[in-house]
Amino acid sequence: MTDKKIAVLLPCYNEEQTIEKVVRDFKRELPEATIYVYNNNSTDRTAEIAASIEGVVVRNEYRQGKGNVIRSMFRQIDADCYIMADGDDTYPAEHAREMARMVLEENMDMVIGDRLSSTYFVENKRAFHNFGNRLVRWLINKLFAGNIKDIMTGYRAFSYDFVKLMPIESNGFEVETEMTINALDKKFNICEIPVQYRDRPEGSVSKLNTVKDGMRVIGTIFRMFKNYRPMVFFGLLSAVLFVLGSVGFMSVFIEYLQTHLVLRFPTLIVATVTILASIILFSSGLILDIIIRKHRQNALLQINCIKK
């Protein structure tokens, strides 16, 4: 791996308490790597401390949010392998070399540092975070036919191909969810390795808002489900409307058979419109599914060409 270019990516917002240790840990484990600290409008000494360490590249991203930071990192940095971690010292750098090896020698496109199979539920004392991780994992694996153990971990390794073909739309913490879904949809090579998670040191505060960011993650899942599985998404909506419309129509039709009169014109009109709406939704889902399949084929061909 010594002839390969490795980049360590550390997005940071107010991490003055931990950033020096995190940087030095990664320098120790991957001395050949270039370490990039992206400061995201920190109001403390994060950028100053990182810049004081020899060999560290410090850049600023003024658009607030982790997704904005990672988008800029992916656009601006070229490397054979990318290691991404948080600047809060919750992910041990000792796993970084093995993660890089799996990208460079085993042709993995994404190596996920799986916290949930090791110490996460013991170290993390925030019950709603634990519940949220389980819920997101269940949703994504069900909706996108995956088998990922840790969807929202911030500790990952990427190939050059994945980084340059990943269209990041998210602005905030939902970016990890977006990357995982995109990797599943485009059939990138994915693997997971257990990593020892440790809670933030005393005095270090999490930037994650459990409710607000949790809702963003759930919204991202359903937005991407609509975009990547339109036939299923619109088909389900169509089925619901068709059943409702049919129930209303049949009630009017049965009355007509009994009395030879249409006694409830408003119900008939609503039922007919509902059934028509269900047909339109089904047709839309079918058309979008054809478009998405073609787009997916083009993306896979592009990946194949790059891998040559």
Role assignments for model-derived ranges:
Residues 3-4, 32, 55, 77-80, ...:
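Active-site acidic short loop of glycosyltransferases
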Residues 61-76, 81, 93-173, 177, ...:
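Acceptor/aglycone-binding surface of glycosyltransferases and processive sugar-polymer synthases
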Residues 15-18, 42, 92:
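Donor nucleotide-sugar binding loop of glycosyltransferases
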Residues 14-28:
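Short, well-formed alpha-helical segments that are part of the catalytic scaffolds
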Residues 39-47:
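A conserved acidic beta->alpha catalytic loop
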Residues 2, 170-171, 175-308:
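Hydrophobic helical membrane-anchoring modules
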Residues 5-7, 34, 178:
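Cell-envelope/extracellular polymer assembly enzymes that use nucleotide-activated donors
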